[in-house]
C-alpha cells in the first residue's frame, strides 16, 4: 500500500470529480483471508491499509463489500524489458497519465494533529532536541526468503549495516528489529524500541529521522518523502517494480558511495 499511497491525490488532481475508495480490513479479510499467513511479520497484515490511508483527504472512504469492478495492480501498462518502473507509474499509465502528471508520486501519509503531538512527545522524551536515526531490520536480513527460497546474503547485509552504523555511532536510533538487538552481528546506539508503538506513530517518528536505514520494506518506503531512506536491495541486480526513485537502494557494490550522501 505504501508505494501507491500518492495515487488517491494524483487521481483527484487529474479527475477532480472522481471518487476514490479503498478496501477496508473486512473486505481484505473476505478476499485474501486464506493467504494472510504469507505476511508472517504482522498480527493482521490487512491493517496496513489503515496505517497508510487513515486521515487521507483524497480517500472518499473504506468499503466492506466490492460489488462492481475493482481496479488493482493488474491494470497497468509496463515495459517487459524495464521491470524497475515504479508500480504506481505503471498503474497510472493505465489511467491515461502522462509522465508530467505523475512526477510527484512518492509515498505520502496524512497524520492527525493528535498523532503528531503524541509522536513529538515520544521524540522529545527519548531524543530530546538531538538528531536521531531510524533503523528497521526485518526477517529479510538473514535466513531464507519465503517467496524465492534463496538465502539472504548475510555477509553483505552485515557489512552494509555495519558501515552505516559505525559512521553514525553517536547517533541514537529509534528502531525495530526482528530479533533482539544483541543477536545481530552489529551494534548501534539505542534510543527507543518501537516494537509495541502504534504503527502510525512509528511512521511519524521515522518521518522526522535524520535518515532511515535497514532491510527493504514498506514501512521505510512509506516515509521516504520526509526522511532520506537507505534500504538493502531485495532483488539485486534485477530490481522489480516495488522500487521508488526517492529511495537509496544498497548493495555490496554501492553502499560506500551511498553512505557518503549523508
Language-model features: where?
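Catalytic machinery of carbohydrate-active enzymes
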Residues: 1-262
Amino acid at each position: 500500500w505504501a508505494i501507491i499511497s500518492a495515487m488517491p491525490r494524483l487521481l483527484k488532481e487529474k479527475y477532480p470529480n472522481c471518487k476514490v475508495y479503498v478496501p477496508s480490513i473486512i473486505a481484505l479479510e473476505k478476499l485474501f483471508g486464506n493467504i494472510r499467513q504469507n505476511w508472517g511479520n504482522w498480527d493482521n497484515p490487512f491493517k496496513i491499509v489503515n496505517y497508510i490511508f487513515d486521515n487521507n483527504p483524497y480517500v472518499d472512504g473504506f468499503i466492506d463489500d466490492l460489488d462492481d469492478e475493482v481496479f488493482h495492480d493488474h491494470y497497468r501498462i509496463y515495459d517487459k524489458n524495464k521491470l524497475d518502473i515504479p508500480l504506481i507509474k505503471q498503474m497510472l499509465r493505465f489511467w491515461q497519465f502522462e509522465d508530467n502528471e505523475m512526477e510527484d508520486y512518492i509515498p505520502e501519509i496524512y497524520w492527525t494533529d493528535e498523532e503528531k503531538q503524541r509522536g513529538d512527545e515520544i521524540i522529545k522524551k527519548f531524543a530530546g532536541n538531538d538528531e536521531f536515526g531510524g533503523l528497521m531490520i526485518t526477517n529479510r536480513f538473514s535466513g531464507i526468503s519465503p517467496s524465492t527460497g534463496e538465502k539472504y546474503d548475510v555477509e553483505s547485509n552485515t557489512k552494509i549495516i555495519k558501515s552505516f552504523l559505525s559512521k553514525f555511532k553517536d547517533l541514537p536510533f529509534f528502531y525495530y528489529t526482528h530479533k533482539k538487538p544483541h543477536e545481530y552481528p552489529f551494534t548501534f546506539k539505542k534510543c527507543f524500541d518501537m516494537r509495541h508503538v502504534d504503527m502510525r506513530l512509528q511512521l511519524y517518528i521515522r518521518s522526522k529521522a535524520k535518515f532511515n536505514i535497514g532491510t527493504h520494506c514498506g514501512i521505510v518506503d512509506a516515509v521516504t518523502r520526509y526522511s532520506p531512506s537507505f534500504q538493502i536491495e531485495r532483488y539485486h541486480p534485477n530490481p522489480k517494480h516495488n522500487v521508488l526513485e526517492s529511495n537509496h537502494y544498497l548493495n555490496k557494490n554501492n553502499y560506500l558511495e551511498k553512505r557518503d550522501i549523508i
